[in-house]
Amino acid sequence: MTVYHFVGIKGTGMSALAQVLYDLGYTVQGSDVEKWFFTQKALEERGIPVLPFSKDNVHPGYTVIAGNAFPDTHEEIEAARQLSVPVIRYHRFLGELASKFTSIAVTGSHGKTTTTGLLAHVMQGAHPTSYLIGDGTGKGEPGSKYFVFEACEYRRHFLSYFPDYAIITNIDFDHPDYFANIDDVFSAFQQMAQQVKKGIVACGDDPYLQNIQAKVPILFYGLGEENDFQARNIVKTTEGTAFDVFVRNTFFASFTIPRFGTHNVLNALAVIALCHYEGIDAGTIAARLQTFQGVKRRFTEKTVGRQVLIDDYAHHPREIMATLEAARQKYPGREVVAIFQPHTYTRTQTFLSEFAESLQQADYVYLCDIFGSAREHHGKLSIRDLQEKIPRSQLLEEQNVSVLKQHRDAVLVFMGAGDIQKFQHAYEQAVLSA
């Protein structure tokens, strides 16, 4: 049997895929940079070897799975070609793997990681289910019929997939380094929808998704009355959110989720609709929704002294609004402080005004330097351009995080898709050593 060697095994998707293959009984190893990433923990727990990059890592009889960040000129990929070892890109391999199961792709501009994790958790309550989540978590369940996986629209990678079912959470303009505009994004999702084999569950509150064409039935969910699955009587508390679900205007069941913000009602509704379609009973769905622990880097909370620290992946204005709304729901009456690190110069430039508007939902705003992508040039843009648009906002550096101590009893929300976590870690150290 072949050995699967992952070039860039610490990537979130790559790490999750390696875990799935390992669990299914395959021999797996990988290589990456030596810097520690949170995705390593699950690999180390399984005893999956993680090696430094070297052309000597590749041997005849191996199959190389290459991360999308690595060019064909990478030493290990070149070594594989010289040895006639097959090299397959991450998204293509994932497409082939998914075809062996009843596959459910979860996609959309926002909310796909949480929705993938929630769907996998709920379905496991009824059937053995394998899954791959974009937070670096994967599980291969031997004998499983279902495979739930996150499908990313970036560079149209999700066009490598031909799933049985798809959940589409929303369509929004993002990844401006690749997509030209919202119409370009829509065309990618439209093409993906045409590849779904059995059925689509889509958010009917989204104006773009209302215009999606497909060869299979589309079930719409949302808060609007015209949806097939509608959430009504939403009650938000500091413990979570309760709501009733109506299927084509007929009461189906009541649900409670230990999550916050309207976006999480929609994520749960997508999962409820898919599970209903697959014949999972309301009692099982309700019980599993209540025990969902969340996914990594999505509203991950920690109490430090009298403050609550939240780590969140939000890196788009719409995501920032949703995260701050959730913080206000769970901690009403407490000061909410946003600490934001913009991710990529192209995104920061494109959404400069929108970032300023969304961040002003917080009581105080601290800005960290822009986290640039290896693929881009920053030109003249700097974090000060964003600071000028947000009254009373301050710049934050790793060395001066102690300034956050003045916000006693506050909720500190660290947001970004780069290395914002290092600012939180630095702050935690500053508090502990005080």
Swiss-Prot record:
Main location: cytoplasm
EC category name: ligase
Cell division keyword on record: yes
Pathway: Cell wall biogenesis; peptidoglycan biosynthesis
Keyword Nucleotide-binding: yes
E.C. code: 6.3.2.8
Stored HAMAP family: MurC
Family according to the record: Belongs to the MurCDEF family.
PANTHER family the record matches: UDP-N-ACETYLMURAMATE--L-ALANINE LIGASE, UDP-N-ACETYLMURAMATE--L-ALANINE LIGASE-RELATED
Name of this chain's protein: UDP-N-acetylmuramate--L-alanine ligase
Source organism per UniProt: Geobacillus thermodenitrificans (strain NG80-2)
